Amino acid sequence: MTDAPTPEALTNEPAQASSLPSLAITGASGNVGGTTARLLSERGLPLRLLANTPSRAPELPGAVAVKCSYEDTLTTRSALEGVDVLFMVSAPESEDRLAKHIAFVDAAAASGVRHIVYLSFMNAAPDATFTLARTHFHTEEHIKASGMTYTFLRDNFYADFFVELPDEEGRILGPAGDGRVGVVAREDAGRVAAGVLADPGRYEN
């Protein structure tokens, strides 16, 4: 039985990527990605945690952190060498968010990733009122055309994020009109992602 990597094994050296676990997780230092990584680690699955700053990735049994940046194609391709299944958490909101997503998806396909699980958004569409849902739609379309098999997890707004939104008068301002929303806990989103990643072939879209 091989010993699990120690914290000292955390690395940002892409040259070692080919010998690392074939299940890769982005966003592991965040809420959904962190929950996903923890639950998969508890199942005994070896993980490759992709992070801009590997030292910020959680220290989990069987997990190794590797430096990876969505916009840095060369670093991404090295980090994804030998990866079979990839969990892609969307990049932080920015003007070039879609460009980062496209670059990352292209690098994943070029690196030989077989299956990608993408954390998308409910009702992703090119004309969505919620502008970020448009980015998710175009990311989904690019993944579909990439040649990789895929699973799209379409979350709604996070319940534990809503408490951070009200202004000083208790209002949440946004382009929703009289619309309603069905929220989801980030912990639950992570549990679903972990279940899919543990058996991705069962959930191909």
Task: Locate predicted features.
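Rossmann-fold cofactor-recognition segment
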Residues: P61-D72
